[in-house]
Amino acid sequence: MDIDPYKEFGATVELLSFLPSDFFPSVRDLLDTASALYREALESPEHCSPHHTALRQAILCWGDVTNLATWVGTNLDDPASRDLVVNYVNTNMGLKIRQLLWFHISCLTFGRETVLEYLVSFGVWIRTPPAYRPPNAPILSTLPETTVVRRRDRGRSPRRRTPSPRRRRSQSPRRRRSQSRESQC
């Protein structure tokens, strides 16, 4: 089965794979962040959002994986085998959990659309040859500000809505002309 845990959220495993593995904070840091920001919602019996549900599942899954790794580590006599198991869990499963936790915490913090915009921006940036791209990668925390700025630029500020006296004078002949044209029709 080809299951993509991000599909229902508008992302894909491939989209997250553009972010380097060292981009994601440690599982411990992500768990602390989730707890600090969303503990009440995560522990609540009420359904909050699909992101909260996914976070709960990822946290429970990580707990089970670490319990299994601890059990295997305790019951394996061969230190080399123990190290292989611990390294495998930390490298492969740890990265997947870090990606999941980061994605859902970021969606709850910044909004899903902003996170998706960031993933696409980063994907474009990383695939662009270094000679043709800006030196710095996009930063997720700045995207909401950028989006807000863009929205402000589309609308007019209250000051611009009130024309200056000079502009009023220049507009009045146009108004008269258009009024006279309307009266002619």
From Swiss-Prot:
UniProt-recorded Gene Ontology molecular function terms: DNA binding; RNA binding; structural molecule activity
Q: Where does the record place a coiled coil? A: none
Q: Which domain of life is it from?
A: Viruses
Post-translation changes = Phosphorylated by host SRPK1, SRPK2, and maybe protein kinase C or GAPDH. Phosphorylation is critical for pregenomic RNA packaging. Protein kinase C phosphorylation is stimulated by HBx protein and may play a role in transport of the viral genome to the nucleus at the late step during the viral replication cycle.
Family designation: Belongs to the orthohepadnavirus core antigen family.
Q: Name one Pfam family in it.
A: Hepatitis_core
| Renumbered ranges of sequence repeats | 157-163, 164-171, 172-179
In Swiss-Prot or TrEMBL terms, this protein is called: Capsid protein
Give the start-end ranges of region RNA binding.
179-185
